[in-house]
UniProtKB/Swiss-Prot annotation:
Originating species: Haemophilus influenzae (strain ATCC 51907 / DSM 11121 / KW20 / Rd)
Record gene name: putP
Compartments where located: Cell inner membrane
UniProt keywords, alphabetically: Amino-acid transport, Cell inner membrane, Cell membrane, Ion transport, Membrane, Sodium, Sodium transport, Symport, Transmembrane, Transmembrane helix, Transport
Name of this protein: Sodium/proline symporter
Keyword Kinase: no
């Protein structure tokens, strides 16, 4: 297993490269602001690539291609919804959140921003929001651990229980050492590696056919064999089903690990440039992932002898294509892209979870006067604790990356998405409204499948839709029933809005 294996050598070089960046970032990390937000000094390119890489986890190279391989282009509605959601997140939220968090006592985390934005005399809002982050991000981290474990299990033929630790170890190490700067710098490299793999692989799958006519003919045979039209965007679904797939885009407004990239940018103007870079990267990556899943259908239909692994485990489709179509050295680089996707998102989520405990729980409730050095080291220790919990959740070998991501994505989108949007655009919003929105959104996501009868179409609706809608309604109703915010809060809101418009 550990002889002269080009894939192993490539992986090792890649991991050591990431660790080296972590060590370099260590020397730029002097205080908690550096560890959590990199001192708010990220440029447009790093912001764009870091936001993209921390967003598109192992789901991009495993979950989405696997879903398309299994069901066809109808799964592309997820990509359509995500693209629209990401664009409006950059357009509506990015610049405002950068300005508003800085003017609200230089808030370093979402819970701290909510607390400062609404001027709560008590810290219950911070406590509830930090708890929601820990619950859903730990589940989200588990999806990254599962993706990494399946990669190591496939490549090196080790037991899943062993692969869990291999997949998580490198990510934990450079996040522990370097904090936000390490995560952002490595994200930039990893985003480049991901787009390289996602463009190259579908092209080589197509080139494996004599011409497009042969490709089309084999695809038609594959469709006839299962009586399914893989190229139909509307096949085997309902309007509610399509809405559920497209509703993934709503989740962007509430993802802490993505919003942190906006907060860390050096200026609003750099965010405008970053939006163009990030959206271009995202469209190419999603198109490549869909292409991998779709083109793999006729490829493996024409080669049934090598299709066993993919037919049993569709999420392995990219891994199998990389191993089959490329020499071991190139395959090792391409497969490192999966590790890159896993590491980039997992590291971002570990850091947000760690900062939530350090800044919002420890400094907020236990030791308000803790030194910067103490807080940074506590943050590092919390990275280890959250990672251990994620590994424990990921113990089930049958866990699906897409399902874990789907649940956590809905949780954040419903609990935080409406609160973030209303906090930036409606100054009449109150702390009671924010609290109601968070709780209603989070509870809806957990309760939807338990309350709605399984034999109805509503059971199949993605939890994001009712969660986002009910949370928004709760914010409006409770805010209007509450006393108006204090004048200082209204003045800060106006000041932030003015600063944002001047900074554009």
């Amino acid at each position: 297993m550990f002889g002269f294996d080009p894939s192993l050598i490539t992986f090792t070089i890649y991991i050591f490269g990431m660790l080296l960046i972590g060590v370099l970032a260590y020397y730029y990390t002097n205080n908690l602001s550096d560890y959590i937000l990199g001192g708010r000094r990220l440029g447009s390119f790093v912001t764009a690539m870091s936001a993209g890489a921390s967003d598109m986890s192992g789901w991009l190279l495993m979950g989405l291609p696997g879903a398309v391989y299994l069901s066809g282009l109808v799964e592309g509605w997820i990509a359509i919804g995500l693209t629209i959601g990401a664009y409006f997140n950059w357009l509506l939220v990015a610049g405002r959140l950068r300005v508003y968090t800085e003017l609200n006592n230089n808030a370093l985390t979402l819970p701290e921003y909510f607390h400062n934005r609404f001027g709560s005399s008590h810290k219950l809002l911070k406590l509830v929001s930090a708890t929601i982050i820990l619950v859903f991000l730990t589940i989200y981290c588990a999806s990254g651990v599962v993706a990494g474990a399946k990669l190591f299990q496939n490549i090196f033929s080790v037991e899943y229980s062993t692969a869990l630790w291999y997949g998580a170890a490198a990510t934990i190490a450079y996040t522990f050492i370097g904090g936000f700067l390490a995560v952002s710098w490595t994200d930039t490299i990893q985003a480049t590696l991901m787009i390289f793999a996602l463009i190259l692989t579908p092209v080589f799958v197509l080139l494996s056919f004599a011409d497009t006519a042969q490709f089309s003919a084999v695809l038609e045979q594959a469709e006839a064999a299962v009586n399914k039209d893989f190229t139909d965007l509307f096949t085997s679904t309902t309007p509610l089903g399509l809405l559920s797939l497209a509703a993934w885009g709503l989740g962007y407004f509430g993802q802490p690990h993505i919003l942190a990239r906006f907060m860390a940018a050096d200026s609003v103007k750099s965010l405008i440039k970053a939006r163009r870079i990030s959206m271009g990267w995202m469209v190419l990556c999603l198109a490549g992932a869909i292409g991998i899943g779709l083109f793999a259908i006729p490829y493996f239909f024409a080669n049934p002898a090598i299709a066993g692994t993919v037919n049993r485990e569709p999420e392995q489709v990219f891994i199998e294509l990389a191993k089959l179509l490329f020499n071991p050295w190139i395959a090792g680089i391409l497969l490192s892209a999966i590790l890159a996707a896993v590491m980039s998102t997992l590291s971002a989520q570990l850091l947000i979870s760690s900062s939530s405990i350090t800044e919002d729980f420890y400094k907020g409730f236990i030791r308000p006067n803790a030194s910067e050095k103490e807080l940074v080291w506590l943050g590092r220790i919390m990275v280890l604790v959250i990672a251990a919990l994620a590994i424990w959740i990921a113990q089930d070998e049958n866990s699906k990356v897409l399902k874990l991501v789907e649940f956590a994505w809905a949780g954040f989108g419903s609990a935080f998405g409406p609160v973030v949007l209303f906090s930036l655009f409606w100054k009449r919003m109150t702390s009671s409204g924010a609290m109601a929105g968070m709780l209603v959104g989070a509870v809806t996501v957990f309760a939807w499948k338990e309350v709605v009868p399984a034999d109805t179409d509503w059971f199949k609706v993605y939890e994001m839709i009712p969660g986002f809608a009910f949370a928004s309604l709760a914010i409006i109703v409770i805010s209007l029933l509450s006393n108006k915010p204090e004048q200082d809060i209204l003045n800060t809101f106006d000041k932030a809005e003015k600063a944002y418009k001047e900074a554009k």
